[in-house]
């Protein structure tokens, strides 16, 4: 059986949750491999909209195993809240598995994220203030607290006390703000651990057994390649690696098991937070796309910046993440725009460049070189195949595929699960 990775090709919010939910129907295990509750997934089916941040999108299928992998950072309070959110809607979570090696986000991570962002002032990154960066910093510094520690009260208390000495000194001396007391955190978070205890296990065993048995595993990335700490618009990035290659290194052994990588894009571009954005629209067309596309971040609620489709960005994502299949979302949002534009390359200091620059300064000075295409006015939200799309819409999809170098496998004409159309199976043998 083929196993598949789903990654975002832009700056997140491309609709990965919807596509993962759709592909979950034919998978047997769905695993998230990085990030935390800074990511937001919106899934809509049967007229109901669900919003998740930590739990994999496949949770709505009772017969699928859903995994929160060891590469994630988990806010136990947020996780317990999300579990309650699902239970209130009669969604079973008995199929959830949580890695005992995933790192824990604690109140001091949230506080440090907030005060550091405030300290940066005009140089702020635009963090979601969910404690993600500080938690990954502790992981790299080898002082992090893991889920396994959270379940052992004595081990948790010992590590928490040691960490609070350092964190309080930092908060009080550098940021001139109040620190935390051990008792403010210990009992509450230990109780959260007890509430999730039944889901906790060694998820590498779950995943390797599934792969060895030939079961279909779907690896679900969060954010997007352009927010990858190595390959994205550093430092305006997240603190982990959304790129597909990391899915194996943080979840399973190094044996090659992934057959296909699905790159999810919008038919335009959005970005939440700061940093250079070459194709950004600051006019009425941008406002129209934002409103028609209901563009507000699932996690932050912030209205994103909006721009034309940037093939330079998606080509970069294809190269660094090994993308084999393109899933293009929100095509319906572009209806009614007379002339559409696609960025095909950049102009930098009078020179044409085809590749995405590593230098943030250079990127900020890049001008997009556009190719114009005629738009369409028809309502395409009911289209079930390429042949049902207007000619101009078909040409737009074909051109995006050509410019990115990625064959189009899925296209979406609305937010509902039923508005997703498959041109070729991503679970194919080769």
Curated annotation (Swiss-Prot):
Listed GO biological process terms: 'de novo' AMP biosynthetic process; IMP metabolic process
Signal peptide: none
Active site (catalytic residues): 13 (proton acceptor), 41 (proton donor)
CDD domains, per database record: AdSS
Keywords carried by this UniProt record: Cytoplasm, GTP-binding, Ligase, Magnesium, Metal-binding, Nucleotide-binding, Purine biosynthesis
Residues holding IMP: 13-16, 38-41, 128, 142, 223, 238, 302
Cofactor: how bound: Binds 1 Mg(2+) ion per subunit.
Molecular functions (GO terms): adenylosuccinate synthase activity; GTP binding; magnesium ion binding
Any Pfam family hit: Adenylsucc_synt
Reaction(s) catalysed (UniProt annotation): IMP + L-aspartate + GTP = N(6)-(1,2-dicarboxyethyl)-AMP + GDP + phosphate + 2 H(+)
Subcellular location: Cytoplasm
Pathway(s): Purine metabolism; AMP biosynthesis via de novo pathway; AMP from IMP: step 1/2
Cellular component, GO annotation: cytoplasm
Enzyme kind, highest EC tier: ligase
Annotated Mg(2+) binding sites: 13, 40
Cofactors required: Mg(2+)
Function: Plays an important role in the de novo pathway of purine nucleotide biosynthesis. Catalyzes the first committed step in the biosynthesis of AMP from IMP.
Assembly, per entry: Homodimer.
Entry-linked NCBIfam families: PRK01117.1, purA
Family statement: Belongs to the adenylosuccinate synthetase family.
Protein name according to UniProt: Adenylosuccinate synthetase
């Amino acid at each position: 059986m083929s196993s598949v990775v789903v990654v975002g090709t832009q700056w997140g919010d491309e609709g990965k949750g919807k596509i993962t939910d759709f592909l979950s129907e034919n998978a047997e295990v769905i695993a998230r491999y990085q990030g935390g509750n800074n990511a937001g997934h919106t899934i809509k089916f049967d007229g109901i909209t669900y919003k998740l941040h930590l739990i994999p999108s496949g949770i709505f299928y009772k017969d699928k195993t859903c995994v929160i992998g060891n590469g994630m950072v988990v806010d136990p309070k947020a996780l317990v809240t999300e579990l309650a959110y699902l239970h209130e809607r009669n969604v079973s979570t008995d199929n959830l598995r949580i890695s005992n090696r995933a790192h824990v986000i604690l109140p001091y991570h949230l506080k440090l994220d907030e005060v550091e962002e405030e300290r940066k002032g005009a140089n702020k990154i635009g963090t979601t203030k969910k404690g993600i960066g500080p938690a990954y910093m502790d992981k790299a510094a080898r002082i992090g607290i893991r889920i396994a520690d959270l379940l052992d009260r004595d081990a948790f208390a010992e590590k928490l006390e040691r960490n609070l000495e350092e964190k309080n000194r930092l908060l009080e001396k550098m940021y001139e703000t109040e620190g935390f007391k051990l008792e403010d955190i210990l009992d509450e978070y230990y109780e959260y651990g007890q509430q999730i205890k039944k889901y906790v296990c060694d998820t590498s065993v779950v995943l390797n057994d599934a792969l060895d048995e030939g079961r279909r595993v779907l690896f679900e990335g969060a954010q997007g390649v352009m927010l990858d700490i190595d390959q994205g618009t550093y430092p305006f990035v997240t603190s982990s690696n959304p790129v597909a290659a990391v899915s194996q290194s943080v979840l399973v052994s190094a044996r090659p098991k992934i057959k296909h990588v699905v790159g999810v894009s919008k038919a335009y571009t959005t970005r939440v937070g700061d940093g250079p954005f070459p194709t950004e629209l600051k006019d009425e067309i941008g406002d129209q796309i934002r409103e028609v596309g209901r563009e507000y971040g699932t996690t932050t609620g912030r209205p994103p910046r909006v721009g034309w489709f940037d093939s330079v960005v998606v080509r970069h994502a294809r190269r660094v993440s090994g993308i084999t299949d393109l899933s293009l979302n929100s095509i319906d949002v572009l209806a009614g725009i007379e002339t559409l534009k696609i960025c095909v390359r950049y102009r930098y200091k009078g020179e044409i460049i085809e590749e995405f620059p590593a230098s943030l300064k250079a990127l900020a000075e890049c001008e997009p070189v556009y190719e114009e295409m005629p738009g369409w006015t028809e309502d395409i939200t009911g289209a079930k195949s390429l042949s049902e799309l207007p000619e101009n819409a078909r040409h737009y999809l074909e051109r995006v595929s050509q410019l990115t170098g990625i064959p189009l496998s899925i296209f979406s004409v609305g937010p509902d699960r039923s508005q997703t159309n498959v041109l070729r199976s991503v679970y194919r043998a080769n």
